[in-house]
């Protein structure tokens, strides 16, 4: 479980990225790099670190399921992820 402050910071960054996405897109098309530089640093999507949606863990993140390997394994064993089952061959 990540610290609550890290999870809050991540959510705040996500909101900033969403808020400035259209503005950033227009400034890039117009090659207005001076105005682009004046936007908040956290509005840049490159600065976002993918985190687990359940507990905020930043490592071992699986993009397709938006969760860490630990939560993925736990939920898969419980059968709560549709279409996922243990492999056998």
Curated annotation (Swiss-Prot):
**Which keywords accompany this UniProt record?**
Plasmid, Ribonucleoprotein, Ribosomal protein, RNA-binding, rRNA-binding
What GO MF annotations does this protein's record show? Answer: rRNA binding; structural constituent of ribosome
Q: Listed GO cellular component terms? A: cytoplasm; small ribosomal subunit
**rRNA-binding as UniProt keyword:** yes
Specify the domain of life of the species encoding this protein: Bacteria
Q: Which GO terms describe its biological process?
A: translation
Q: How does it assemble?
A: Part of the 30S ribosomal subunit. Contacts proteins S3 and S10.
Q: Which PANTHER family match?
A: 30S RIBOSOMAL PROTEIN S14, SMALL RIBOSOMAL SUBUNIT PROTEIN US14M
Query: Could you identify this protein by its name?
Result: Small ribosomal subunit protein uS14A
Species assigned in the record: Ligilactobacillus salivarius (strain UCC118)
Q: State the encoding gene.
A: rpsN
């Amino acid at each position: 479980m990540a610290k609550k402050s890290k999870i809050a910071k991540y959510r705040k960054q996500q909101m900033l990225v969403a808020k400035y996405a259209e503005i950033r897109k227009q400034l890039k098309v117009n090659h207005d790099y001076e105005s682009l530089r004046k936007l908040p640093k956290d509005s840049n999507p490159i600065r976002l670190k993918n985190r687990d949606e359940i507990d905020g863990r930043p490592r071992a993140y699986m993009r397709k399921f938006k969760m860490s390997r630990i939560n993925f394994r736990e939920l898969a064993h419980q059968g709560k992820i549709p279409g996922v089952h243990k492999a056998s061959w």
